[in-house]
C-alpha cells in the first residue's frame, strides 16, 4: 500500500514557507491506518520491546495501537504541567528557542527495552529529548519508528546510532 497517498500537504502552514504534512487522512482510512500500525508492529516484533513511548499528541495516535497490538504498555511524553505525578524532563531546541518535555519518573524501569513511536521525524529535537529521558530512567532505546520523515531537516543526525524505521519520506 502506498501510504504517501494518505498524507495531505498543506502549503504555508503553520507559517509562510512551511509545508505541513497532515496524517489525518491516513487515520481516517481504516485500511491505511491499520497497514501503518502493522508495519511498525512488524518492525518491533524481533526487538523484544517492553514498552512503547510516544510524544504528545500524535505519538499517542500512532503509539497506542502499536502497544495494544504487541500486548505491552504505553508511556506518554507530555509538555510540562500535563502529567499528575512526579516527572523528569528534558529540554530541546525548536526553531524559535527552547521547549521542554516530561514523562513520569516511574514510566520506565531500568533495563526495559523501549520503542519510541511518533508521527513525524523533522529536526529530531523531540525524539532526542525523549531518548534522554528514557536513558536517564535506565531504559534501553531499542528503536524509533515514525510514519513520516522530512528529508533535509537532519532528524536522522540527531538520533544517529539508534535503529530507526520510517514509513514515508517527504521533502523538508
Swiss-Prot record:
Q: Which reaction does it catalyse?
A: AMP + diphosphate = 5-phospho-alpha-D-ribose 1-diphosphate + adenine
BP GO terms, sorted: adenine salvage; AMP salvage; purine ribonucleoside salvage
What assembly does the database describe for this protein? Answer: Homodimer.
What's the superkingdom here?
Bacteria
Q: Which UniProt keywords apply?
A: Cytoplasm, Glycosyltransferase, Purine salvage, Transferase
Query: Main localisation, per the record?
Result: cytoplasm
Q: What task does this protein carry out?
A: Catalyzes a salvage reaction resulting in the formation of AMP, that is energically less costly than de novo synthesis.
The broad enzyme category this protein falls into is transferase
Question: What EC number(s) are associated with this protein in UniProt?
Answer: 2.4.2.7
Regions that span the bilayer = none
**NCBIfam families from the UniProt entry:** apt, PRK02304.1-2, PRK02304.1-3, PRK02304.1-5
An example molecular function term from Gene Ontology annotations? AMP binding
Q: CDD domains under this entry?
A: PRTases_typeI
List, alphabetically, the GO terms of the cellular component aspect.
Answer: cytoplasm
Protein name stated in the entry: Adenine phosphoribosyltransferase
Q: Which family does it belong to?
A: Belongs to the purine/pyrimidine phosphoribosyltransferase family.
Taxonomic lineage: Bacteria, Bacillati, Bacillota, Bacilli, Lactobacillales
Recorded hits in Pfam families, A to Z, give: Pribosyltran
Pathway per the UniProt entry: Purine metabolism; AMP biosynthesis via salvage pathway; AMP from adenine: step 1/1
Cellular location(s): Cytoplasm
Q: Which organism is it from?
A: Streptococcus agalactiae serotype Ia (strain ATCC 27591 / A909 / CDC SS700)
